Regions:
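Membrane-embedded helix-loop-helix hairpins and adjacent transmembrane boundary segments
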Residues: 13-16, 23, 27-538
Length: 538
């Protein structure tokens, strides 16, 4: 099966290249090297899926969704952060920095770094302990068991929220795959997107959580190599670090943390304190990301979370710093005439692809490195898409079909339902990603807000407030998700102080809803509060 996929991939690529415009009728040696490197990388990913599938990692629901809670600290840390740092790490962040300068992208990165650390510090330990005690293997299942929701209304709503926001999130990943091959080789966008999606689905359905987590570890290594190599090459091509700084300084507001550069007008724009708070609010999203917090539940030993936290935080800080630098460096490479100026959001998000293409023209070794860099972009996309597909599959087969709808399924039927869900959501994601001009950063931003507001407050209150009840949790979840849509499409367009990132007001509204509704309704049952005291202390 894997061999057939790679043959199809190469055939699609060759057909597209050979039917391109005149003057580009043959693959160059550099392009062949890059394709071989990427195909070997994809082969390695499928091999991991086959390996863990044969080991039985996808044979039971507990193994398929949570790896049997056997994850070591390094794999847990890197899997969590690789699944977090989707295509926006190697496309969204550099693209925004290239186009608009430091303010928005840097404050966003700072918020994400703080959010990462706090998530590991205050959520990880209690969630690992609590979920193990309750026997929960998904986030919706944890909410239902934590609040004693025997009717599983909470898990049903949570599963619907996951589907609503994961589908566009996954679509942004498939869009990145299509953009990669279209920008570099001229491969038809939709063909590349479909083939890349097939590979992601293949190793996800075969190996489950363990395959996803170990491929995430491998992919985080590729992402790191890509970032380091491209920043060094970019500085050299731009004419040195001094040239990079001079070029950036010449643009009004480009390096100013309280202004910003308006690429459309070539002038500085104000970046207010409200805007800074708004972008820092990205960090709030971590508390509600199902595909990230699931890693906390899967670690082998609770005591190993401290090591995981240190590894994860260091990697996130370094990788985002380099990603922002690449955007700034990329502008100077354009100024030097080495790559074209990129004037739109969709174009600027291809800056790393353009730099890798430039690198591939400087000999065999650098062509191989370019292939590794482009594999890193695939890694950033695939490491998030696979985790999201797995989380969505668990929501449908476990939380909706079995818990909410009461369907009785044996182990084999459960696994078939999970794998069918992975395929179905991937197909819907590809349909939504059909437009090649959509922005990765903006799509991820909206989905991030949805999860952060709908799940983040509920997660925090479930772990730290004994009085929170199922009515309050339900109110918070619905309020958070609804306010994201309302603020994004009705309030933010009013401009001014209203044009803040929708996650912040939605998160606050959800917190208020949880407190008010919990206090206005009966206290949780004694069994629920006794479990809370046992796990979290009185």
């Amino acid at each position: 099966m894997a061999f057939c996929i790679y043959v199809c991939f190469l055939l699609c690529y060759i057909v597209q290249v050979l039917t391109k415009a005149e003057g580009e009728n043959h693959m160059t040696s550099a392009q062949i090297i890059i394709v071989v490197t990427i195909v070997l990388y994809l082969a390695a990913m499928v091999f991991v899926g086959v390996y863990f599938g044969k080991k039985g990692s996808g044979s039971s629901s507990d193994d398929f969704y949570l790896g049997g809670r056997k994850m070591g600290p390094v794999v847990t840390a890197m899997s969590a952060e690789a699944s977090d740092m989707s295509s926006y790490l190697l496309m969204g962040l550099p693209g925004l920095a290239y186009l608009c300068g430091l303010p928005e992208v840097t404050w966003t990165a700072i918020g994400l770094a703080i959010g990462t650390y706090l998530n590991w510090l205050i959520v990880a330990r209690r969630l690992r302990r609590y979920s193990a005690k309750l026997g929960a293997i998904t986030i919706p299942d944890f909410f239902a068991r934590r609040f004693g929701d025997k009717k599983h209304l909470l898990s049903c709503i949570a599963a619907v929220v996951i589907l609503i926001f994961f589908i566009p999130y996954t679509a942004s990943g498939f869009k990145a795959i299509g953009t990669l091959f279209n920008s570099l080789f001229g491969v038809e966008y939709h063909t590349a997107m479909i083939v890349g999606g097939i590979v992601v689905v293949l190793y996800t359905v075969m190996g489950g959580f363990m395959a996803v987590s170990f491929t995430d570890l491998i992919q985080s290594i590729f992402m790191t190599i890509a970032l380091i190599v491209i920043v060094c090459f970019g500085v050299q091509q731009a004419g040195g670090l001094d040239t990079v700084i001079d070029n950036a300084s010449a643009l009004p507001g480009y390096l100013n943390m309280t202004q910003g550069y308006d690429a459309a007008t070539g002038t500085a724009s104000t970046y207010s304190a409200l805007s800074i708070v708004s972008t820092l609010a990205w960090g709030l999203g971590y508390f509600g990301m199902p595909h990230i917090v699931l890693r906390f539940m899967a670690i082998r030993e609770e005591k190993e979370l401290n090591q995981s936290r240190r590894i994860a935080t260091i990697w996130v800080v370094i990788s985002m710093f380099i990603a922002v630098c690449i955007g700034v460096i990329g502008y100077s490479v354009s100024a030097a005439g080495k790559v074209p100026f990129l004037t739109t959001s969709a174009e600027s998000e291809t800056i790393i692809i353009k730099l890798a293409d430039l690198m591939s023209r400087h000999g065999v070794l650098l062509a191989v490195m370019a292939g590794i860099i482009l594999s890193g972009i695939l890694a950033a996309t695939m490491s998030t898409a696979d985790s999201q597909l797995l989380a969505a599959a668990s929501s449908v087969s476990q939380d909706l079909m079995q818990h909410s709808f009461g369907m009785k399924m044996n182990q084999r039927t459960t696994m078939l339902a999970a794998r069918a869900t992975v395929i179905g959501i991937a197909l819907i994601g590809m349909v939504l990603a059909w437009d090649p001009n959509s922005s990765v950063f903006r799509v991820v931003s909206f989905a991030w807000a949805g999860f952060g507001a709908a799940f983040g407050p509920v997660m925090l209150f479930s772990l730290f407030w004994k009085r929170a009840n199922k009515q309050g949790a339900l109110a918070g979840m619905i309020t958070g998700g609804a306010v994201v849509f309302i603020w994004k499409y009705l309030i933010a367009p009013m401009g001014g102080a209203w044009a803040i990132y929708e996650l912040l007001p939605a998160f606050l509204a959800a917190c208020i809803a949880i407190v008010i509704v919990s206090l206005a309704t009966p206290a949780p049952e004694k069994a629920v509060t006794d479990t809370f005291d046992e796990i979290c202390g009185k």
